[in-house]
Amino acid sequence: MNFDSSPIAAIATAPGRGGIGVVRVSGKNISSIIEAVCATKGAELQPRHATFTNFVNADGSVIDQGLAIYFKAPHSYTGEDVLELQGHGGPIVLQMLLTRCLEAGTDIGLRMAQPGEFTHRAFLNDKLDLAQAEGVIDLIEASTEAAAKSASQSLSGAFSKTIQDLVDKITNLRMLVEATLDFPEEEIDFLEKSDARGQLNGIREALQAVFTQASQGALLRDGLNIVLAGQPNVGKSSLLNALAGSDVAIVTAIAGTTRDKVIETIQIEGIPVNVIDTAGIRDASDATDEVERIGIERTWAAVKTADVIIHMLDANRGPTRADEQIVERFPENIPVMRIWNKIDLSGHRPAIDRMPDSTHIYVSATDLQGMDLLRGELLRLIGWQQTGESLYLARERHLVALKSAHDHLEMAAQHAAHDSEATDPALDLFAEELRLAQERLSSITGEFTSDDLLGVIFSRFCIGK
């Protein structure tokens, strides 16, 4: 995203009708817009005070009435002068007010904001770092209470502070290494007297703890896609209804009732889970019509995109050759849980049986026996841990950076393991790996970040944020 410092304006509230709508303006020399749009009868707006006023056209006709709030730089969201006009939340009146602001700001070059540009300016003006900026959009998009709490942690700077603490520790260790390299004549045994290995091990342990928390937080953000697959009439739709707690899928005794995907989003321990019910799988030649055949094709397409496959089986009937053929087509890289349904008919009790290659759980979707076992095993399978600690709503780029930093620290540990003189090349390599680890961690908060990445991140925001 190329930075254009011209003043910007946008509607800051969500599209649609509401009780209140906000038009936001940010940039230099916006006092002319205040004078032109706000009928304050000569009184100046006091910074950070709400002033009730009419919003007017150039001819003095009233567009709307509401509150005008002026934030003087640097005490604003963007770090620039900001004007917020809070009026009624109708889309037409808000568009009229925005158009009036753009007309009044022609002389100062006022233009429409790009997606995420207000937050981008906040980042450039050091009002927040990159991880906090991502926390803004994660908080807006949070689909569960747990995800919202974790996003709030990132927005408040908790994640950034943790990363900065790691960076500071690596920096201190680098300073000792560089000093030893610069003054070899002192003949200091750096690795022993500065306890470099001990410091490095402490950093590695701290980084691993952060990675664990971030990985858990990523589950809260990205959620999980679970596909229910199996032969017709084994209870896939009944299981979807049991997990959802309502009748979201049609259930009948007729095999092949489900003809297309049915998707329902639920929560398990605060993790958003997309449960995808699919058409029953059987040989295409046995399909009753073209619609069922297409439904079976879509089932296999859904299976390929799953994070976890739940293979539904009939506990009352037992395993069949058709079940084995279905298993043979499952992708090898996707974990599979085998759920034996209808234990209310078979005489089985709710149970879980973990085998080397798969997990078998016995349930009844109609009377909900074994459902807690199923939910718990799903969490275990995806690596969810109840740590009791605050989680960071990490993104994929955060996890990649943390993993890369970990790898560089591992290489540094290997170089530090050599019993060598201070001037040995291994110490140079030790210092370089520390530098690279520090750089990877700093990319999380935006200290070392390419313009291309910034453009991608902020383009995902809404226009007025």
From Swiss-Prot:
Subcellular location: Cytoplasm
Named cofactor requirement(s): K(+)
Matches recorded under InterPro entries: G_TrmE (IPR031168), GTP-bd (IPR006073), GTP-bd_TrmE_N (IPR018948), GTPase_MnmE (IPR004520), MnmE_dom2 (IPR027368), MnmE_helical (IPR025867), P-loop_NTPase (IPR027417), Small_GTP-bd (IPR005225)
Enzyme Commission designation: 3.6.-.-
Positions that bind Mg(2+): S237, T258
Residue numbers binding (6S)-5-formyl-5,6,7,8-tetrahydrofolate: R24, E84, K127, K465
Binding positions (GTP): 233-238, 252-258, 277-280
UniProt GO BP: tRNA methylation; tRNA wobble uridine modification
Residues of the TrmE-type G domain: 223-383
Pfam families: MMR_HSR1, MnmE_helical, TrmE_N
Cofactor descriptive note: Binds 1 potassium ion per subunit.
Family: Belongs to the TRAFAC class TrmE-Era-EngA-EngB-Septin-like GTPase superfamily. TrmE GTPase family.
Stated role: Exhibits a very high intrinsic GTPase hydrolysis rate. Involved in the addition of a carboxymethylaminomethyl (cmnm) group at the wobble position (U34) of certain tRNAs, forming tRNA-cmnm(5)s(2)U34.
SUBUNIT field: Homodimer. Heterotetramer of two MnmE and two MnmG subunits.
Protein name: tRNA modification GTPase MnmE
Species, as recorded: Janthinobacterium sp. (strain Marseille) (Minibacterium massiliensis)
